[in-house]
């Protein structure tokens, strides 16, 4: 079975991947059949280059992409194009649909960037608000406060009153010395027998 997957290249802490068609039993960086593209995850935005014809060929011959490669191929629109061709659409219809898809993706990307920039702007505003509040609070705290004269108040202490509460005496029921429980008797017998 053939897989379309990533093959690591590049140096330490700077990964660059080749997108390859390889036998599913081959190790990750081992033998492969063909290089069909490149992927650079460290670039901003990520760079994906595909040989669309070769990827389409391998997928039509039964090659299965891994989940990561599938998402990369999906972002380029190749999966959508292959699906349209499989449904029997003409080349003109496929080209028209792909153009619509590209526009839709551009709108999504722009919307996502707008949301990110709006969040950054709100964060900056929120960070600026406490600074403004501190600037306003500083002069208010430094302003001298006029103290009003305190009126003297006479404190009258009331004499102590003793109140005796009527406590009802509850007669306690006499505890009758009951016979020890049978378990206790059995234990006493065992102790006496051992000695």
UniProtKB/Swiss-Prot annotation:
Single GO MF descriptor: structural constituent of ribosome
Low complexity biased stretches: 171-181
GO CC terms: cytoplasm; small ribosomal subunit
Keywords attached to this entry: Ribonucleoprotein, Ribosomal protein
InterPro entries with a match to the protein in the record: Ribosomal_bS16 (IPR000307), Ribosomal_bS16_dom_sf (IPR023803)
Disordered as annotated region, ranges: 171-195
GO biological process, one term: translation
Assigned protein family: Belongs to the bacterial ribosomal protein bS16 family.
The protein's name: Small ribosomal subunit protein bS16
Protein source organism: Chlorobium luteolum (strain DSM 273 / BCRC 81028 / 2530) (Pelodictyon luteolum)
Originating gene: rpsP
């Amino acid at each position: 079975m053939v897989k379309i997957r990533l093959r690591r290249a590049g140096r330490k802490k700077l990964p660059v991947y080749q997108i390859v068609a390889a036998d599913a039993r081959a190790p990750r960086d081992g033998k492969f059949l063909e290089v069909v593209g490149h992927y650079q995850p460290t670039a901003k935005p990520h760079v994906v280059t595909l040989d669309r014809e070769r990827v389409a060929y391998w997928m039509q011959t039964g090659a299965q992409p891994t989940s990561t490669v599938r998402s990369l191929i999906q972002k380029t629109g190749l999966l959508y194009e292959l699906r349209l061709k499989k449904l029997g659409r003409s080349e003109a219809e496929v080209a028209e649909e792909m153009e619509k898809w590209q526009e839709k993706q551009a709108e999504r990307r722009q919307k996502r960037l707008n949301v990110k920039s709006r969040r950054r702007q709100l964060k900056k505003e929120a960070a600026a608000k406490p600074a403004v509040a501190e600037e306003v609070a500083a002069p208010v705290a430094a302003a001298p406060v006029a103290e009003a004269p305190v009126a003297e108040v006479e404190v009258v202490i009331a004499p102590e009153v003793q109140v005796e509460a009527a406590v009802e005496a509850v007669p306690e029921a006499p505890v009758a010395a009951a016979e020890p429980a049978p378990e206790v008797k059995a234990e006493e017998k065992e102790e006496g027998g051992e000695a």
